[in-house]
A protein has these predicted regions:
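Short, charged recognition helix plus adjacent turn
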Residues: 4-8, 76-87
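A short, Lys/Arg-rich alpha-helix, primarily the initiator
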Residues: 6-30
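Short basic helix-loop element that most often maps to the first helix and adjoining turn
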Residues: 22-41, 66
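Recognition helix of helix-turn-helix/homeodomain-like DNA-binding domains
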Residues: 43-57
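DNA major-groove recognition helix of helix-turn-helix/homeodomain DNA-binding modules
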Residues: 60-78
Length: 87
């Protein structure tokens, strides 16, 4: 079964899927891309991009990471206690 992403950890707080959806939408629109443009670059379906942007809480994490990579970002894990990034 695919791992489902419910939250992403960021700094001292939590980035929810609603927050992630807003980030994806903002980065996409800043680039002047349609949902289809982003989907093509990430090799995903337009409906998946729409699900992410609508805040659907059960999107597959690997595919969400692919969207961020297509937007020029990487997702990293950081220890909240030490600030150390896991590589």
């Amino acid at each position: 079964a695919a791992v489902r992403l419910h939250v992403l950890i960021r700094g001292p707080g939590v980035l929810t899927m609603r927050d992630a959806s807003a980030v994806v939408r903002e980065l996409r629109t800043q680039r002047g891309w349609t949902q289809q443009d982003l989907a093509t670059r990430a090799r995903l379906s337009r409906s998946f991009v729409a699900d992410v942007e609508s805040g659907k809480p059960t999107v597959e994490s690997a595919k969400l990471f692919d969207l961020f990579q297509a937007l020029g970002y990487e997702v990293v894990l950081r220890d909240l206690a030490t600030g150390q990034v896991l590589r």
